Amino acid sequence: MSDSGIFLVILSVVNLAIVLGIGLFVYESVREQEPRAPKVGGALFGFHIVLGLLILFWPGARLPIAWFLGIVLAIQGLFLIPWTRGARSLNGAAGYLATDGSDFVKMDERDIMFARNRSILPGTPQYEQYYKIHPEHKDYDERRRARGGPLGKPGVIDSCYRPNVAMLVSSFELPNLLGKASRVDPGASAARSTYGTKEANKAQLDPDKATKIVKAWAKHLGADLVGICRTDRRWAYSHRGEIHYGEWEEWGKEIPDPLPYSVVIATEMTHDMVMTAPHTPSVIESGYNYAKGAYITTILAHWFGAMGYRAVAEHNRHYDLLMVPLAIDAGLGELGRQGYLIADKFGPRVRVFAVQTDMPLVPDKPIDLGAEKFCESCKKCAESCPSKSIPLERQRKVDRGIERWKLNEETCFEYWGKVGTDCCVCMAVCPFSRPYRTIHKLVRYILRRSELARIVFPYIDNFLYGKRWRPRKEPQWLEYPRGTKSENFHGSEGLS
């Protein structure tokens, strides 16, 4: 074959490879109901088809096209050069501390929005005590409490469509039932009669073996990600604030130091459900995952008890610990701009739970997904947030000794009450939330290894997918009456 023939073959093969890659991108984008990406991908696909025809039938165009494709490949090659500066997440959640930790202040559970909304009730001693200490919260809390519980009037954005609201309500019944079984002592439940309760009855397992069993058991039960960490006492709440079962004597008590190890799990929220945000299918998916997490962690906790060890399940009806820093320490992900976990494989599209235990286990190492640098330039969650609760600034601020982008919990929680769902728009619009499929796997692979990609990819993502959020069509079995658009619920009205 002549040199010109070899040149023609190489040029054609390179362009064909690009065409196939773009074709896969278009296919995945259509499958994901993306409104903009298939159009952009289709235009690029057509452009390279034209290039292919020019390569075959116009010899004079081959050299300029070769230069063009060479430049394209060279730019792509730059993203494959492994170079990162090392994210703070590699030091675990402690990497986000602003200083040496001397100015760190533990989170008080009494201050979280859920506790202020449903566990500080007018006319109670807790009400008088809390607002004597925090009078700055009183006016907002009373206005928000008048709107209802955490979700206000559930499902109001979708005309309170009863089948969907009933799915949400029924999902939360399981955590309600399991909350009382969260704390487990050795020999608890049915294991008591078989193994007894004495210290000598602890099962003697090598930590490596125990770790393998625990991780496999958790995944068999339904966890999508599992990690283990030493439990850092800084990530425990300082005082009890959430009361679910009438034990009001516990309100305001100091939360004891946690057990030495934590098994942290994440469950994936189905992409198609999340992408309907802020409509009811997204909160149905949240409720389902909270039920799933309660189920998994309760079984794990009682497994530890049956093995002769103490354990505490951390789920929607019993939290001693903050889940996000725990998950970072356990190697499940990083802290994102929206204030919660960007998980491996699934991005923010997860719910996180844990089990404390004193069984010796082997901790995992924190990971670097490239999310922190990516979030600096991306800002999609902040720009799409209906209540403007996520900061747009590139730089982080220090809060309780932690350097991070600080979510405005009050405006966020107000929006929940307005639409009757937990919103999920920031979760849905995040580029890391895209399904764990071929194209997105490749992007994640590059982001983990390339500092340049972390800076440039947010702009490429905006070009391909657009910057603003639009809810996707819900699955047919979750169709709700039309007439209420998410746009009608944007803004922070009612806060003034």
Predicted regions and their residues:
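Glutamate identity and glutamate-enriched acidic tracts
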Residues: 28, 32-34, 109, 142, ...
